[in-house]
Amino acid sequence: MPTDPDSRLRGNDEAILLAEGQKSAVTEYYLNNGEWPKDNTSAGVASASDIKGKYVKSVTVAKGVVTAQMKPDGVNNEIQDKRLSLWAKRENGSVKWFCGQPVTRNANDDAVTADGNNKIDTKHLPSTCRDTSSAGK
């Protein structure tokens, strides 16, 4: 099992890269439909279990929030089975993305709420992925 810091960062980097790969589809869906896609299918991306990697178990789209779930084993203890999210908010006619702890969104709200379950401790997140659920308010 990887225990060195580089392995931990690779896991986080992979999670962010796989999640970021869904951003354009989520953004396009929102711009075309005026609402956030409710799931992977409506966003036009692969199923959550098909978006995976060496360290990432799945990537889920839920109401426009993209959440990467780390694998329960084969990754550093600090991130085993933990999650991080990317989410967008409307801003001046466009869409601005944020990255950080896992969040959820109700229906077509712009606001997101922190989802404290299985979150990666902030100190283990890359500096570019430390937005809070209140970002952009």
Role assignments for model-derived ranges:
Residues L31-K137:
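Periplasmic/extracellular, small/polar-rich flexible segments of pilin-like filament-forming proteins
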Residues D6, R10-S47:
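Conserved hydrophobic/amphipathic alpha-helical signal-anchor segments
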